[in-house]
Amino acid sequence: MCGIVGMFRLQAGRPVDAALVAAMNQAQYHRGPDEGDQYIDEQVGLGHRRLSIIDLASGQQPMIDESGRYVLIFNGEIYNFMALRAELETLGHVFKTHCDTEVI
């Protein structure tokens, strides 16, 4: 099972502590030894430790959508992701990976 961490600052001008998010993420290394990364914004910090099951090579998270507006971390498995992916491709979405997370 993967590991997920997050931090949100309500007060503008008090940015998220990137070192703290990194330390929280590292503390759950055992939950996702395959890889880990984080996303830091002014008020949001997200971390993810990955246990690779589907798309072993390119399913890194946090994942950013094609518009750059949304950042996602996810743990689980989407069993019908191939059907969802095909439907989204007919609507014009372009995928960067073969990971089930990207259909969200």
Regions found by a protein language model. Give the residues of each.
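N-terminus-centric sequence/structural signature that marks the extreme N-terminus
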Residues: 1-104
